[in-house]
Amino acid sequence: MPLNEFSLIEHYFSAIGQADGVMLGVGDDGALLDIPAGQHLVVSVDTLVAGVHFPPDAAPDDIARRALRVNLSDLAAMGATPRWFTLALTLPGADMNWLKAFSRALAADAERFGCALVGGDTTAGPLTISIQVMGLVPSGRALTRVGARAGDYVFVTGTLGEGAAALQLFDPSVELAGSVRERLKERFYQPTPRLREGLALRGLASAALDVSDGLLADLGHIAEQSALGADLELSALPVAPWLKKLADAGTVQDWVLSGGDDYELCFTVPAENLAAIDGMIVGGELIATCIGRMTPNTGIRCINGNGMSVQVEQTGYRHF
């Protein structure tokens, strides 16, 4: 595809989203952004490749939503408010219908989550989407993976396992009921970045991250960064009732512990902040479950309903 055809893309991406602080956005060599005093800039980037992170024939609107949301999840994990993002788009061909659907979905989500596209790049090649998100957090208030202490309580938002279960959508040998298929499709392409929850946890959580690589792996990151371990209560893991009916208990446990792609927040809470977190949960301000505690020993121990440590095979995150 001749590269000059990419001039058509300006029509679709020149005005996506609105946010304060954009002094100069799409159309120049770079964006000029105003960072308010007393705020830190949080920056994260993820790349999605067709055939690796989503099916090559996925609908463009689905791709757009997934690409932006998985990036925004990183901002949520740091307690940041989304402001701006850039887009690097590699396309195998200039399909105007594809671009229209992709840009409309991207614009809708940018509006929903309060961020603006401020720049990017386009080129020809295999379908690849790279999005860099930028957000703001008050100085000294960012949530990070470092800071957990022995005895801290481990929590996770929402429910787990649905992101990994969604891979069944792309297995032709698996038959799924229509309602289940729609739930899994929504979970895969439209994960909800826990931005509101991230803001609520500022000043209360000692460490946090989003569950993208699997609960065991991601909780392991918190433990490693703090030179600690954790005891994980298997019976406390939050699983949607409908998901439990989708496969045998062992498979569901594998989805929950190792599957990844859930984009929930895993966070630790010191004992002195536990009452505040419990109050938010009881009051409906936060949907989260206590699933264990940090320990002075290294490694993650999985504890069954009888209080016994059990060996759990960690299969690890699987790409599409």
Predicted features and spans:
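Short, surface-exposed beta-edge/turn micro-motifs
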Residues: 29, 152, 262-265
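Short, flexible active-site-proximal loops enriched in glycine and acidic residues
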Residues: 75-84, 114-124
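Glycine-/charge-enriched secondary-structure boundary and capping motifs
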Residues: 1-15, 39, 59, 92-116, ...
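Extreme N-terminal cap/leader segments of soluble proteins
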Residues: 1-59, 78, 83, 87
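Short, well-ordered amphipathic alpha-helical segments that serve as non-catalytic structural scaffolds
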Residues: 63-75, 105-106
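A generic local secondary-structure boundary/capping motif
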Residues: 20-22, 31, 107, 118-122, ...
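Short, acidic (Asp/Glu-rich) active-site segment that either coordinates a divalent metal cofactor
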Residues: 42-45, 143-199
